């Protein structure tokens, strides 16, 4: 299936300046949200408990909330429907208990007046563990970006590497800010979505960069802008079909999945759009803004190819006994 004819070259770089300006404005607004409002840390990072309860009748959400609010230790409790009208999810901050106290039994005792129920899941994360998980989550994102920059530098050149990382940071900032806008708790699911997004977005960028390199080395194009336009146009069908496939799969997760996975599915849904956009409009344009020179790049790549060919020739001569 081909959405766009390969012979048709679209002028992406002509409009990329507008894309960069829009992205810069959105990124600044997103940074404002991140710094001034901040994330609502979930149980994974802040510590606390998550209780899944199923009733034999419709769950009395308001009554359950009132029962917990009467207890001084359970301030800030959140009660929401989970999957069906009979099932609810209860979240509350970490509660200190004595050695002889069982938190599970305490919660069950609080819920007794609300009707016939079954506690199906009870997870608790301590503050220390939550802090460690938060540090490891942030570290994993930083290491992923560094590893990608090293890899792209080795495969292409530093301008491409820096451009790809800037595009990825742009993606992460916008998606992370959407977590605040949609009032999603920052948990491990969100970190998993961000890491998945980084891998997905860099894959798109690498495919476009590969095609750009082929166009430049073929010397069919006169300048870098033309080479980039031809490269993006030739990979556009593949990029859009892949993105649409991922988009609709994640959309189904958002619509029909339970609330417990919304921390993964919604950031991924937004990230699919943002990642595809940045691979086409941001990463190539940033490489040009960083002073990428097509002639110098061609000379360096030609030198590398000749060096590799000479090594291969010497290896063959050595194996044949001529050297």
Curated annotation (Swiss-Prot):
Q: What is its main location?
A: membrane
Q: Which domain of life is it from?
A: Bacteria
Membrane-topology annotation of the record: Multi-pass membrane protein
Q: Which Gene3D superfamilies has this protein been placed in?
A: Multidrug efflux transporter AcrB transmembrane domain
| Cell compartments where the protein resides | Cell inner membrane
Which InterPro entries does the entry mention? Answer: SecD/SecF_arch_bac (IPR022813), SecD/SecF_bac (IPR022645), SecD/SecF_CS (IPR022646), SecD_SecF_C (IPR048634), SecD_SecF_C_bact (IPR055344), SecF_bac (IPR005665)
Query: Where are its TM segments located?
Result: 19-39, 138-158, 162-182, 189-209, 244-264, 269-289
One example of a Gene Ontology biological process annotation: protein transport by the Sec complex
**Disulfide pairs?**
none
How is this protein organized at the quaternary level? Forms a complex with SecD. Part of the essential Sec protein translocation apparatus which comprises SecA, SecYEG and auxiliary proteins SecDF-YajC and YidC.
Protein family (similarity comment): Belongs to the SecD/SecF family. SecF subfamily.
Tell me, in a sentence or two, what this protein's role is: Part of the Sec protein translocase complex. Interacts with the SecYEG preprotein conducting channel. SecDF uses the proton motive force (PMF) to complete protein translocation after the ATP-dependent function of SecA.
Name of the protein this chain belongs to: Protein translocase subunit SecF
Q: According to the entry, what is the taxonomic lineage of the organism?
A: Bacteria, Pseudomonadati, Campylobacterota, Epsilonproteobacteria, Campylobacterales
Underlying gene: secF
């Amino acid at each position: 299936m081909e959405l766009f004819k390969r012979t048709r070259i679209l002028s992406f770089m002509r409009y990329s300046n507008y894309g960069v300006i829009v992205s810069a404005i959105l990124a600044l607004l997103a940074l404002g949200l991140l710094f001034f409002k901040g994330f609502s840390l979930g149980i994974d990072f802040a510590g606390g408990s998550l209780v899944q309860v199923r009733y034999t009748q419709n769950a009395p959400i308001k009554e359950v909330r009132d029962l917990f609010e009467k207890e001084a230790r359970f301030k800030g409790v959140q009660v929401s429907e989970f999957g069906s009208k009979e099932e609810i999810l209860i979240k509350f901050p970490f509660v200190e208990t004595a050695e002889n106290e069982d938190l599970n039994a305490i919660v069950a005792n609080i819920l007794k007046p609300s009707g016939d129920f079954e506690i199906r899941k009870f997870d608790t994360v301590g503050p220390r563990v939550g802090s460690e998980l938060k540090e490891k989550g942030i570290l994993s994102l930083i290491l992923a970006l560094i590893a990608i920059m090293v890899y792209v530098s080795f495969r292409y050149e530093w301008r491409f590497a820096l451009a790809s990382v800037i595009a990825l940071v742009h993606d992460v900032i916008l998606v992370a800010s959407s977590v605040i806008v949609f009032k999603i708790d920052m948990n491990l699911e969100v970190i998993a979505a961000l890491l998945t997004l980084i891998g997905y977005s860099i894959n798109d960028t690498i495919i476009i960069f590969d095609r750009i390199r082929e166009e430049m080395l073929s010397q069919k194009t006169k300048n870098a802008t033309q080479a980039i336009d031809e490269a993006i146009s030739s990979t556009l069908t593949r990029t859009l079909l892949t993105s649409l496939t991922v988009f609709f799969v994640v959309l189904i997760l958002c619509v029909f999945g339970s609330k417990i996975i919304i921390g993964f599915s919604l950031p991924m849904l937004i990230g699919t759009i943002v990642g595809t956009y940045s691979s086409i409009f941001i990463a190539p344009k940033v490489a040009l803004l960083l002073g990428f020179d097509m002639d110098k790049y061609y000379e360096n790549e030609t030198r590398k190819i000749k060096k590799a060919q000479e090594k291969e020739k010497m290896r063959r001569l050595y194996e044949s006994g001529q050297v």
